[in-house]
Design a protein with these regions (language model features):
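TRNA-recognition modules of translation machinery and tRNA-sensing kinases, especially anticodon-binding
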Residues: 1-225
């Protein structure tokens, strides 16, 4: 989370929102990377940002947890390929302390994508997202301003579903506080969305929990995506 410029006191990092592990309780982080993130958080080190200020706690950084975003893979890829143009797409399981309801699950799959190249831009990102959702069968797509600690500008993507707008994912351009410590000067278009929520819409379900219920009679009628 430090690599994504999420403040160490952000609500998303509390026990109420994240599954922390008891074994192992901590994971060793590369000292050089840790110092870069510490400087960025404290005073924006090398960027135009002033950072978050305050004290940076290395022990907080090393706390082991179940990933809340597949963006951890994105960060690793950019760090390993800072000067290589790339377009990366992936699907992975994530875990969050969510209250279970018709559109939320504590364990689900996230779709993640990035465009990492010198000419990457917000119009390119929006066009990519509109194309993606239109190929999924959603012609009514809208983009709204949003806020995420790790992107600026930030947007949310919504599709029209049963007469109402349903938020499917967040996106934006990674902030310099994220990209510069990873060694790249190029902009990075990034987006993520929930696979189960998208599947719910495609299958015409009213409740996301139906995707995991054990009724064989219902499951036998579901198409294989």
């Amino acid at each position: 989370m430090d690599a994504l410029f999420i403040p160490q006191d952000h609500p998303a990092r509390t026990m109420q929102d994240t599954f922390y592990l008891s074994s192992p309780e901590s994971i060793k982080i590369d000292e050089e990377r840790l110092m870069q993130w510490a400087g960025t958080h404290q005073d924006g080190r090398g960027t135009t940002s002033r950072g978050w200020g305050g004290v940076f706690d290395a022990k907080e950084s090393e706390r082991a947890l179940l990933r809340t975003h597949t963006t951890v893979n994105t960060v690793k890829h950019i760090a390993n390929n800072p000067a290589v143009p790339s377009r990366v797409f992936g699907v992975g399981r994530v875990f969050r302390q969510e209250t279970i309801d018709r559109t939320h699950l504590p364990e689900f799959h996230q779709i993640e994508g990035i465009i990492h190249e010198e000419q990457a831009s917000l119009p390119m990102l929006i066009t990519t997202l509109r194309t993606f959702y239109s190929k999924m069968g959603y012609s009514d797509v809208r983009v709204r301003p949003a806020y995420f600690p790790y992107t600026e500008p930030s947007i949310e993507v919504e599709v029209l579903w049963k007469g109402a707008w349903l938020e499917l994912g967040g996106a934006g351009i990674f902030r310099p506080e994220v990209t510069q410590p990873l060694g790249t000067e190029w902009p990075v278009c990034a987006w993520g969305m929930g696979l189960e929520r998208l599947a719910m819409l495609i299958l015409g379900l009213d409740d996301i929990r139906e995707l995991y219920q054990p009724d064989l009679a219902i499951l036998s009628k579901m198409p294989i995506l």
